[in-house]
Amino acid sequence: KPAPVEGKTVIGIIFQTDESRISAKEKALGYTHGLVMAIRSAHGTESPLTRYSFDTSFDTIPNKKTGVAWYGDIEGYQWTLNILEAYPGEKIQKCPAFDFTTTDFKPSAPSGTSGWYVPSIGQVWDMLSVFCGGEVAAHLKTLRTYGSDITYYYKYGGDLKLSYDPIAALNSV
């Protein structure tokens, strides 16, 4: 890890610099240097977990279930914009993950950036591949071309046996 720089505060960790894994929307807006995961999670004061949406008819973001679709979805920035448009003003409270991420999230993202947004499943995939160690990355690589329902794969027999704790690996970053 690089040494801290005096007078600077770390607000996030770069997890992706491959331009092919940055969305067309972000590229068009000039956000091409890389993707950053905030070092704080966006959640309420009562829980370290955040619900995606309380709206039972939520359909603003397409539901993707194959490994191909998961890996290919790098549209977190666009999905966040779609949610903000579909749930304007106080209605955003129906989607806590998006509300906490886009409403007064601290630390603020620097000016000239896309700002914070909820990552898509493909962007979470990239984070896990980078931060959870080589075995997780190797396993995820095998699923990039998995064309069946990946949730079924894990629910009914697909397993991942690791020689280490991936959450500990993620938390060590």
Describe the residue ranges of each PLM region.
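Short, compositionally biased
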Residues: K1-T113
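An exposed tryptophan-centered "aromatic clamp" motif
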Residues: E90, K94, F98-G115, I121-V173
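Short hydrophobic beta-strand that contains or immediately precedes a catalytic carboxylate
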Residues: M37, V118-P119
